[in-house]
């Protein structure tokens, strides 16, 4: 059985890591050991932050809805309760967009929520 020298496969493996580490600073971009660690850590951050992004956007939407609702004299929780009682099913992403870019439409929704709470 012939001896296997791994020059080709090792080079391919190294090139794959260096391609992923492209744009990094210092030795992280051109020293294999350091680049491999940096790529692994970047992957961990990416995995974690894909989940955090969903939470952070929901928080942002809630903050924007709360600000818009308070401009119209209602707290976030009462506004959402009023929408539920009025059988208005608009998700938070759209509500936040309305609160920022279409204040008149959002004000109408707040009025409907108020009337549903009063009834």
From Swiss-Prot:
GO cellular component, alphabetical, reads: ribonucleoprotein complex; ribosome
According to the lineage, what is the superkingdom?
Answer: Bacteria
Q: Would I find Magnesium among this entry's keywords?
A: no
What Pfam families does this protein's entry cite? Ribosomal_L20
Q: Which GO terms describe its molecular function?
A: rRNA binding; structural constituent of ribosome
> Which PROSITE patterns does the UniProt record give?
RIBOSOMAL_L20
Q: Which InterPro entries match?
A: Ribosomal_bL20, RIBOSOMAL_L20_CS, Ribosomal_protein_bL20_C
What is any one GO biological process for this UniProt entry? translation
Q: What NCBIfam families does its record include?
A: rplT_bact (TIGR01032)
Q: What does this protein do?
A: Binds directly to 23S ribosomal RNA and is necessary for the in vitro assembly process of the 50S ribosomal subunit. It is not involved in the protein synthesizing functions of that subunit.
Q: What is this protein called?
A: Large ribosomal subunit protein bL20
Species of provenance: Neisseria meningitidis serogroup C / serotype 2a (strain ATCC 700532 / DSM 15464 / FAM18)
Name the gene for this chain. Answer: rplT
């Amino acid at each position: 059985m012939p001896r296997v020298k791994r020059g080709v496969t090792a080079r391919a493996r190294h090139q794959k890591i260096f391609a992923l580490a492209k744009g990094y600073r210092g030795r992280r971009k051109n020293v294999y050991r350091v680049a491999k660690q940096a790529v692994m850590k970047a992957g961990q951050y990416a995995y974690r932050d894909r989940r955090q992004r969903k939470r952070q956007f929901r928080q942002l939407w809630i903050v924007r809805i709360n600000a818009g609702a308070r401009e119209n004299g209602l707290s976030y929780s009462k506004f959402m309760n009023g929408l539920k009682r009025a059988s208005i099913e608009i998700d938070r992403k759209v509500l936040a967009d309305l609160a920022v870019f279409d204040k008149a439409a959002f004000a109408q929704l707040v009025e409907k929520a108020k009337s549903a709470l009063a009834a």
